[in-house]
């Protein structure tokens, strides 16, 4: 397997990665671990690993780790969507909750010191963009 260690200590894993010739070119591939092969397939399907995909995977994993870090430090999380957290709090507590959420989401984790983060909150009666 090919492993990419992330700053927070977790890994992105590409199972049974190997270089194989595809269309006359050496190509890095890995198993589609989240894919079930057809009953008559002789092996698990593979997918091509290329620079753009690897960069996207690292970027998304980093963003997900930041969001998980914020979720662990926040109470009253009603939902999360991509890079957003939504809290459900009484109206009278909304301003304080928004300020606290902004503080948590803009604080870089210990594994990413100095990372500039900006997370201005919105107070809404219903979730929206």
Where are these regions (language model features)?
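Conserved catalytic core of nucleotide polymerization and phosphodiester-bond processing enzymes
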Residues: 1-129
């Amino acid at each position: 397997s090919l492993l990419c260690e992330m700053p927070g200590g977790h890994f992105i894993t590409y199972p049974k990665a190997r270089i194989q010739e595809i269309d006359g070119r050496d190509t890095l591939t890995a198993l589609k671990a989240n894919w079930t092969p057809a009953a008559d397939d002789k092996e698990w399907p593979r997918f091509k690993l290329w620079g753009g995909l690897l960069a996207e995977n690292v970027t998304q994993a980093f963003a997900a780790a930041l969001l998980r870090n914020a979720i662990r430090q926040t109470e009253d999380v009603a939902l999360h969507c991509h890079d957003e957290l939504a809290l459900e709090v009484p109206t009278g507590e909304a301003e304080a909750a928004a300020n606290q959420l902004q503080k948590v989401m803009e604080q870089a984790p210990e594994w990413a010191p100095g990372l500039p983060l900006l997370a201005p909150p919105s107070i809404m009666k219903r979730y929206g963009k």
